[in-house]
């Protein structure tokens, strides 16, 4: 189809084509104040906040909602217990399409590393057309877990009750139960 001297591609596409191109620049974004791969560290009763520091990556999270199952999983994590595949497979998941880094690919890799299974192996995974659809499903109890970029609560905490149907503040109804490695 032709050639280009410069192009903008995702980190995932770079991995696929790294033999054919070089990195000249990389994107930066504002970091958030929570960066641990331990989900319990994210559940301190405060919503993640943007910082003045720049970061070359972000993380994907597994966010448990206010449903009975979501709160059961969150309680296990906050008590220092390891989640099992059966724990996760018995939940209803809201996921993005299979090309989404934070909404599918990295959570699938996280599952693969821990359980030898991926999102495709889950009994109850529902594909959402947007993160706001996933948030609505989470708030209403249609989903127990959603996968998303790590700063989703920073972006949507103010809308949790009014737009998504939450019955309490987002920080009180959700919690992080899994955190992926950095997405570049």
Regions found by a protein language model. Name each.
Residues 2-15, 19-21, 26-30, 131, ...:
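Beta->alpha turn/N-cap motifs
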Residues 5-6, 61, 92, 145:
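A residue-level structural signature of the nucleotidyltransferase/glycosyltransferase Rossmann-like core
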Residues 14, 82-85, 135:
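Short amphipathic alpha-helical segments and helix-helix/interface helices
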Residues 16-19, 53-57, 86-88, 118, ...:
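Extracellular/periplasmic catalytic domains that process cell-envelope and extracellular macromolecules
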Residues 21, 76-80, 106-111:
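"Short basic amphipathic alpha-helical interaction patches in structured regions
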Residues 22-55, 68, 124, 158-184:
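Short beta-strand->loop
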Residues 28-101:
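A conserved helix-loop-strand patch within extracytoplasmic ligand-binding domains
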Residues 89-184:
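Pocket-lining segment of extracytoplasmic ligand-binding domains
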